[in-house]
């Protein structure tokens, strides 16, 4: 997806420009399948049979590193890990990197490949997975009244973010603009959201403050029973607070 994003953007960083183009690919877990396989080999054949590449393949930031190597991008390079928010945070943090002047462009995205026995067992034990095995096509239904959990999937997505003047100077056609980004924590529980959703609302308000205007709602595709009501409450609190600030 990084190759597709660069091709669509028409961006081929070479020479000194490659020093100003970075990579930020987020992942929630990293190379879990490599870790799973290494554990299996060690149990069955002993530690000397574990490939030394395990140490590299399991690291979450290797996706960013491999993209940088493939395209010769020598700018800022790291990853973010923030569970279900990882991809969104990657875009936001990359935008902040550009705004503070540490890059003129960033290849940004998210990737995940957690369909392994260990991951499925772990999520199953938390009670988070859908058990609608008899109807897999409709198992993932985050906004349905009868939702019963989420479905683990694999995938990747990539974007190219650029400083606006840089994009226009080289004749690129911007598809969208990141005008505000906010981040906040509930500091409440390892998996359950804070009941009033103030952390989520606070992140929305921070994004709005940076943008100087109202932002578009982006509902997270969560299928847990408490997900939809809390998400609606977050957005409602977010707009009420914005109205209060505007009236002050």
What residues fall within each predicted segment?
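Conserved beta-ketoacyl condensing-enzyme motif
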Residues: 1-82, 111-120, 214-245
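Generic structural signal for well-ordered, non-membrane alpha-helical segments
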Residues: 56-60, 64, 87, 91, ...
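Short glycine-aspartate micro-motif
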Residues: 20-24, 104-108, 140-142, 175, ...
